[in-house]
């Protein structure tokens, strides 16, 4: 890892800005080879998000993870160690959805990152499958979310965490979030369980049966479930069109 990048990650984690997987456990190293750690520089300062490799040259993440400079780490387990499996690639282009709405009305919260160089496939780095544009994930589906960061309000971790979450009915989130949109968002996490994804886990994938169906978008300020995820299936035409258009522009 470049010394400056490692120092920035160390400072970020000292400030506890990395977010939360609540009620989960440590993932087996490299069991989620599509996971990406994003270090983002913006006028507001340094922040982190999750993301996931969808092709050797593209990472998908949340639209609100935008910044003037983004560094991507692939193949990581402990984000504060210089692991031999890690690949560090800068972002050539960050393409946020043209209809993205910032908080408080978060809509179309999705962004493609074109990498400056292609990722090398290995046991620790592999793309995840994307859904068919016509196939909708159903309530009751048991899915996995992974991310780095806090595991409770005050306790942090540097290693990748994972949690299994169940897709809820749209009404469950419509009752809690004023701007929930069932066409472009998924309601995830049983309100009766203390399991959720939160804050800096933003941009990470909801993976159901080995297919990325959602992107961590937002939730309640307390971190209690359910949380709202961007529905990838609704954006497949835009994703395919954008990757096709940019592939010839290296």
Curated annotation (Swiss-Prot):
Q: Which gene encodes it?
A: Ctsg
- Which catalysed reactions does the entry list for this protein? Specificity similar to chymotrypsin C
- The propeptide segment or segments lie at 19-20
The membrane-topology field of this record reads: Peripheral membrane protein
Listed GO MF terms: caspase binding; heparin binding; peptidase activity; receptor ligand activity; serine-type endopeptidase activity; serine-type peptidase activity
Query: Where's the Peptidase S1 domain?
Result: 21-244
Q: Cellular component terms, GO, for this chain's entry?
A: cytoplasmic stress granule; cytosol; extracellular space; lysosome; membrane; nucleus; plasma membrane; secretory granule
Q: Where do the catalytic residues lie?
A: 64 (charge relay system), 109 (charge relay system), 202 (charge relay system)
The record, for Gene3D superfamilies, names: Trypsin-like serine proteases
Superkingdom, taxonomy of origin: Eukaryota
Q: List the disulfide bonds.
A: 49-65, 143-208, 173-187
InterPro entries given in the database record: Peptidase_S1_PA, Peptidase_S1_PA_chymotrypsin, Peptidase_S1A, Trypsin_dom, TRYPSIN_HIS, TRYPSIN_SER
> What is the source species?
Rattus norvegicus
A biological process term (GO) from this entry = proteolysis
Q: What does UniProt give as the signal peptide span?
A: 1-18
EC supergroup of this enzyme: hydrolase
Q: Which EC number(s) does UniProt give? A: 3.4.21.20
Check the record and name the Pfam families matching this protein.
Trypsin (PF00089)
TM helices/strands, residue ranges: none
Q: Where in the cell is it found?
A: Cell membrane; Cytoplasmic granule; Secreted; Cytoplasm, Cytosol
Name listed for the protein in its UniProt record:
Cathepsin G
């Amino acid at each position: 890892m470049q010394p400056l990048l490692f120092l920035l990650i160390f400072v970020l984690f000292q400030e506890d800005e990395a977010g939360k997987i609540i009620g989960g456990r440590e993932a087996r190293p490299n069991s989620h080879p599509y996971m990406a750690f994003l270090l983002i520089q913006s006028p507001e300062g340094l922040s982190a998000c999750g993301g996931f490799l969808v092709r050797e040259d593209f990472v998908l993440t949340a639209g609100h993870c935008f910044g003037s400079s983004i560094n991507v780490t692939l193949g990581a387990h402990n984000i504060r160690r210089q692991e031999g499996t890690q690949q560090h690639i800068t972002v050539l282009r960050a393409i946020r959805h043209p209809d993205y709405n910032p908080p408080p009305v978060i809509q179309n919260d999705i962004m493609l990152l074109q990498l400056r160089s292609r990722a090398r496939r290995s046991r620790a780095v592999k793309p995840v499958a994307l859904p068919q544009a016509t196939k909708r994930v159903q309530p009751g589906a048991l899915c996995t979310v992974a991310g780095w960061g806090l595991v409770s309000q005050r306790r942090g971790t540097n290693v990748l965490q994972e949690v299994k979450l169940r897709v809820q009915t749209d009404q469950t989130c419509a009752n809690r979030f004023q701007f929930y949109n069932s066409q472009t968002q998924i309601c995830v996490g049983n309100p009766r369980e203390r399991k959720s994804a939160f804050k800096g886990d933003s941009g990470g994938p909801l993976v159901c049966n080995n297919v990325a169906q959602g992107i961590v978008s937002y939730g309640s300020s307390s971190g209690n479930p359910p949380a709202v995820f961007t529905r990838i299936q609704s954006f497949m035409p835009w994703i395919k069109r954008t990757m096709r258009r940019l592939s010839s522009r290296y």
